[in-house]
């Protein structure tokens, strides 16, 4: 088997499980479970792994019948047995066209069927997937086809005073979006300037806290501008004051989003 | 009548332009460039650690989920409190129906400030020429899976 073939095998297997996780109704879930089992059975390397781990035959007719309706499957402690147990369970389900209701009911969460399917696959089938993917990785190493590095590590050379930023937002209700606000070349000075203005413009109930925060930010900006050492005690005082201001400013405000940027930049200042 | 309400949760990227994601299967955290995830052809993301593909929404981080729950609860409570006020106005002066208002409801959780830590190391996947940030744990593994094509 070539390096490429092995990578495709591993990917197809993981994709088959990924599809199972996305099933939204019971017919689709059963169809995708059949495909998943077929992916295992038609692939000699994976099938060999299953056979090596075969410890004993489980009577799932009896196990499901005797199982209390609210009980989850009692998975074996031993890893080999766990592989064999889950594989035989999935075989039994697919060969007998069982409805997910018949065996996955204890895995439900709320009224949605999709959650029952997903939870069963996450809590049970995922264990088998984990064993198989680990085996495939080990097998690749033993076969000597591991080593061609796909991921190359990039050294992060951003530094305070000259960090390039490409800021965006993640919107997390039903979509993921990004808005690019390119502030290339923006440094600690400009963040500090923006932050001081925001602090001055924002109405904060605790006047002393606001005053302290402005003073600390100004002092840090001045020291950075003059190339002087910014003492850790000053960073700590500034961080505490700004964190407290964040709590009063309210989430989502410009002030609440600029403060973490400043804190992060300040904490990254190299110590002498 | 069902009225749809869109609640936006925003979180800025870190200084390198990456946002945090967390696999709901293996709980491993990693970072991607939001613009890459939003490309039309990206329908699923492969976790760099376990390699299982899932819908991008399955990778929301705990802090974002917390704020989604907090904002949703706040909105529901606002509606209920407003309903109580409206009910009081409707039956004001009515001899047959008396409305006794209780204390306004308060949410059980509040939104937290969202910000990215500058952590993890940048890796570039040669297969798709896309970048990601991964933890030391993922780095130490046999090789992270590309979040976009699933190859390692």
PLM region descriptions:
Chain B
Residues 23-26, 47-50, 124-129, 146-149:
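Short cysteine-rich clusters marking metal-coordination/redox-active sites
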């Amino acid at each position: 088997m070539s390096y490429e073939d092995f990578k495709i095998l591993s990917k197809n297997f993981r994709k088959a499980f990924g599809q199972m996780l996305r099933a939204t109704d019971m017919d689709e879930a059963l169809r995708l479970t059949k495909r998943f089992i077929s992916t295992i059975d038609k692939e000699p390397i994976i099938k060999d792994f299953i056979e090596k781990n075969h410890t004993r035959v489980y009577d799932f007719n009896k196990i499901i019948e005797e199982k209390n309706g609210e009980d989850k499957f009692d998975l074996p402690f031993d890893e080999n047995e766990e592989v064999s147990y889950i594989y035989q369970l999935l075989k039994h389900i697919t060969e007998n066209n069982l409805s997910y209701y018949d065996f996955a009911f204890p895995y439900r969460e709320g009224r949605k069927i999709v959650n029952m399917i997903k939870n069963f696959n996450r809590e049970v089938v995922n264990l088998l997937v984990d064993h198989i993917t680990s085996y495939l990785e080990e097998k690749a190493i033993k076969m000597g086809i591991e080593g061609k590095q796909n991921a190359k590590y990039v050294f992060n050379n951003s530094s305070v005073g000259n960090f390039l930023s490409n800021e965006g937002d993640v919107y997390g209700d039903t979509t993921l979006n990004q808005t690019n606000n390119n502030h290339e070349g923006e440094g600690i000075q400009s963040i500090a300037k923006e932050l001081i203005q925001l602090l001055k413009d924002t109405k904060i109930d605790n006047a002393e806290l606001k005053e302290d925060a402005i003073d600390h930010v100004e002092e840090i900006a001045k020291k950075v501008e003059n190339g002087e050492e910014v003492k850790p005690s000053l960073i700590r005082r500034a961080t505490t004051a700004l964190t407290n201001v964040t709590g009063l400013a309210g989430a989502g405000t410009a002030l609440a989003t600029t403060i973490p940027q400043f804190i992060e930049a300040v904490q990254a200042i190299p110590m002498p | 009548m069902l009225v749809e309400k869109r609640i936006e949760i925003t979180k800025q990227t870190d200084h390198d332009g990456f946002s945090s994601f967390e696999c709901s299967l293996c709980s491993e955290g990693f970072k991607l460039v939001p613009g890459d995830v939003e490309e039309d052809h990206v329908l699923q993301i492969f976790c760099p650690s376990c390699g299982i593909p899932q819908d991008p929404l399955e990778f929301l981080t705990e802090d974002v989920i917390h704020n989604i729950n907090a904002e949703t609860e706040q909105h529901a409570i606002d509606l209920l409190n407003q309903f109580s006020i409206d009910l009081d106005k409707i039956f004001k002066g009515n001899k047959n129906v008396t409305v006794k208002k209780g204390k306004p409801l308060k949410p059980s959780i509040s939104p937290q400030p969202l910000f990215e830590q500058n952590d993890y190391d940048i890796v570039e996947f040669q297969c798709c020429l896309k970048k990601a940030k991964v933890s030391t744990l993922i780095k130490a593994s046999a090789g992270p899976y590309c979040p976009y094509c699933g190859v390692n």
